[in-house]
Amino acid sequence: SESKKVFLDAGVPTPQAEILDCSNGIVMPSLPLPFVIKPPCEGSSVGVHIVRRQEDVLPAMKEAVTHGTTVLVEEFIQGKELTVGILDGKALPVIHICPRSGFYDLSNKYPWMNMGGGTDYICPADLPEETAAKVQEAALKAYKAAGVEVYGRVDVLLREEDGAPFVLEINTIPGMTPSSLLPKAAAASGWPYEDLCEKIVELSL
């Protein structure tokens, strides 16, 4: 929720949102449907619900407050899920995240946990050069607005109807296993895994 405020203040393109304080009981969202309900302090899409029908709002809110009393409600944008790794203030190639079913939730991120889902990653993303540059520009703007240094990863939605990029969130400590997304993007840019790790350590000193 703090990053959302930072994005809005800095003019970073990001979905419309409201932050609900449910410490004294559930507060119902005022955004028009469809929208996304998410606990702002969880990772890996835990507790995230895409809500399309009015009757599903209350159950989703009840589930969200089990993760904390602050709930982020965000306009739902139909489009491609992308992520941009950033190293030393420079954007790496865009990755297209392609869940095999539904959206990029826990089961699609970590299919071995429940033997379901799964996701394909296309890097560099299958985008026109101009579109990829727009996505990288939005990601860099978010990275700088949040005051991140050395490295990070920014999740972006590319709206289906007009190809406009919208920043969802920034990961200031992205996964760094050889199969994680930032190393995938770095490899596509010519950075072997060992060199990437050395560069991050060097920049951090």
Which residue ranges define each predicted feature?
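Active-site nucleotide/adenylate-binding loops and adjacent lid/helix of ATP-dependent enzymes
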Residues: S1-K80
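Short beta-strand-to-turn element immediately C-terminal to the catalytic PLP-Schiff-base lysine
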Residues: L20, V48-R53, I86-D88, R159, ...
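Glycine-rich phosphate/pyrophosphate-binding beta-alpha loops
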Residues: S45, R100-F103, N171-A185
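Phosphate-binding site of ATP-dependent enzymes
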Residues: R52-E137, P165-F166
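Conserved metal-phosphate-binding beta-hairpin within the catalytic cores
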Residues: E75, I86, Y143-M176, A186
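Peripheral (often C-terminal) accessory segments that flank ATP-dependent C-N-forming ligase machineries
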Residues: D120-A125, A145, E149, R159-E161, ...
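Amphipathic alpha-helical segments that line or abut small-molecule/effector binding pockets
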Residues: A133-L140, E194-E202
